Amino acid sequence: MKSQSKRTSRLFVFVGVVVAIIIAVLSWRYFGTGSDNNTSGAQQSARGQDTSHGGRRNTPLAPVQAATATEQEVPRYLTGLGTVIAANTVTVTSRVDGELMALHFTEGQQVKAGDLLAEIDPRPYEVQLTQAQGQLAKDQATLDNARRDLARYQKLSKTGLISQQELDTQSSLVRQSEGSVKADQGAIDSAKLQLTYSRITAPISGRVGLKQVDVGNYITSGTATPIVVITQTHPVDVVFTLPESDIPAIMQAQKNAEKTHAIVPVEAWDRTNKQMLAQGYLLSIDNQIDTTTGTIKLKARFNNEDDVLFPNQFVNARIKVDLLQNAVVVPTAAVQMGSEGNFVWTLDDANRVSKHLVTTGIQDSQQVVIDAGLNAGQRVVTDGIDRLTEGVQVEVVTPRSANTDTNPASAEKAAAEAEGSTPHQGRGRPANAPARSTTAAEKS
């Protein structure tokens, strides 16, 4: 009986201890958290009061870069893909048969019209010339003898010593000999021409390509294999295409140029469209549109004195068709695309931003023409746009120089100033903790 009473007493003690612990924990959590919350609330209230008095003055303004819209003369260009072609291309072949004796050019060199390029063995044609000259001498002697006989027959015919038939026969012999002499002269001229053809000269000025036949080979006239190909690159042409919708602008540019006896300028740019290679002028326009692509071909001519353009080279051709006067121009970075269309952020005298919808015109990688929505002299934001909202005040800063950007200490100092002198990560607050302004109460 006593043992059971002891067990019951111990159970009550254990339960009491557990209940006391639970009550203590609940009391601590309730009263301790409330105290902390009250303290935090008081601190936040104090900070709020301090902020209402002077915190706004310490909030940093968003830094932006700005530019002023200006009025300029802006040329209007049409750009098309083009290929460089030689102004003239000649495939040099032999017009006579024979062994190739010599080549008188270096592959890739510039030659002038009339320069000796190659020689075919001339000996067979020299022999033919000698034979033709010998036959001419023989027939010429026969002709001379026939003419003397004809003169005698004419005298005898007057005295009646020979018949008229004999006189006519002699006259025919003279004419026959004259024909033989003319044929011989033709044979001589042909032999001389063949001998001339054995010396192959450049028909045009230009650049020779790689040789196609080596010395020692037997060449026949009319063969498909040329000796060399010459391309005229001074000047050189560029054939490019433009959409058919651009034809009116091109034709108007041509008419304007004809009125002033000027040319329509054309520029050739490299494959990446970053470097201008040469300047030329519009030479001609094709007389029909390609129905497959809906484009028209144009040809431009370039002097190419510095040999920057090579046949079959790919280029971007830019043709100037107009010059806009007093066009409002801003940097391309200032124009943004939104759901309502293109817009820019403008700045007033107090550096407050305002969103303006604009209509853009001609543009490139550096600047864009504003057709409507902006006036010359207005300032527009070019950098820092992602932090802007309507009516917010900003700080206009100038771009740092390359020297400043490459100096780590200067860059860190500038970043700290732009963030309102907030501490560097790891020097007073965790990396993910938000920055806050220093209040007057905390300073005191």
UniProtKB/Swiss-Prot annotation:
Main location: membrane
Membrane topology label: Peripheral membrane protein
Disordered: annotated segments: 37-60, 399-444
UniProt feature, compositional bias: Polar residues: 37-52, 435-444
Sample GO molecular function, one term: efflux transmembrane transporter activity
Record's signal peptide: 1-20
SUPFAM superfamilies in alphabetical order: HlyD-like secretion proteins
Locations listed in the record: Cell inner membrane
InterPro entries (alphabetical): CusB_D23 (IPR032317), Multidrug-R_MdtA (IPR022824), RND_pump_MFP (IPR006143)
A single cellular component GO annotation: plasma membrane
HAMAP family xref list: MdtA
Record-stated family: Belongs to the membrane fusion protein (MFP) (TC 8.A.1) family.
NCBIfam families: PRK11556.1, RND_mfp
Name the UniProt record assigns to this protein: Multidrug resistance protein MdtA
Species in which this protein is naturally found: Yersinia pseudotuberculosis serotype IB (strain PB1/+)
Gene: mdtA
